[in-house]
Swiss-Prot record:
Upper taxonomic lineage: Bacteria, Pseudomonadati, Pseudomonadota, Alphaproteobacteria, Rickettsiales
SUPFAM superfamilies: Ankyrin repeat
Gene3D superfamilies on file: Ankyrin repeat-containing domain (1.25.40.20)
MF annotations from Gene Ontology: RNA binding; RNA nuclease activity
Organism listed in the record: Rickettsia bellii (strain RML369-C)
Record-given protein name: Putative ankyrin repeat protein RBE_0151
The ANK repeat ranges on this chain: 49-77, 81-110, 114-145
Keyword annotations from UniProtKB, A to Z: ANK repeat, Repeat
Domain of life: Bacteria
PANTHER family on file: 2-5A-DEPENDENT RIBONUCLEASE
Keyword Cell membrane listed: no
Signal sequence range: none
Pfam families according to UniProt: Ank_2
GO biological processes: RNA processing
Length: 162
């Protein structure tokens, strides 16, 4: 009998070498915020991306909603692509939410799956206000995983004014 992905999945208890195929689920409760977003975004997408209420609120760019769902226990949780709420706020070009997340424990220093810290991402996006805020108010890794400095990054992405 040939073992395919399907049979290996169903037989994971009997095939220890295929235990890595077991799906990893994270339980996310159905809060009022989550129900609201499920009316806008298909629930399958929310679940597959592993978005929390905070990720959704940051994506919606609503500071009051971010403040209401934010707590220090979930502020640095990553989604399926390894992005924190702070990184999503930087990608969304929203300084007010970036400031709120940093003041409430959003971590800038850990690198994402590409080896960039949040300040590298801000340089790539090109928002001078966010870069300045992160530079003055946070601790960060000056070099990415390839050894490039912040200045190298600015030149590489064409944002020399940073």
């Amino acid at each position: 009998m040939e073992i395919t992905m399907t049979t290996a999945y169903y037989r994971h208890k009997y095939c220890p070498d295929t235990s890595y195929l077991r799906p990893k689920y994270i339980y996310i409760p159905k809060t009022p915020v989550r129900k609201f977003f499920e009316s806008l975004i298909p629930p399958q997408i929310i679940d597959s991306e592993k978005w929390t209420d905070l990720h959704l609120a940051v994506g919606y760019k609503n500071i009051k909603l971010v403040q209401s769902v934010c707590n220090k226990h979930n502020i640095n949780i990553k989604d399926a692509k390894g992005r924190t709420a702070l990184e999503l706020a930087i990608l969304g070009d929203n300084l007010e939410i970036v400031q709120f997340l940093v003041q409430n424990g959003g971590v800038v220093a850990p690198n994402n799956m590409y080896g960039w810290s949040a300040i590298h991402l801000a340089i790539k996006v090109g928002n001078l206000d966010i870069v300045k805020y992160l530079y003055e108010n946070t601790k960060f890794n000056e070099h990415d995983k390839y050894g490039l400095t912040l200045q190298n990054w600015a030149e590489k992405v064409g944002n020399e004014q940073i």
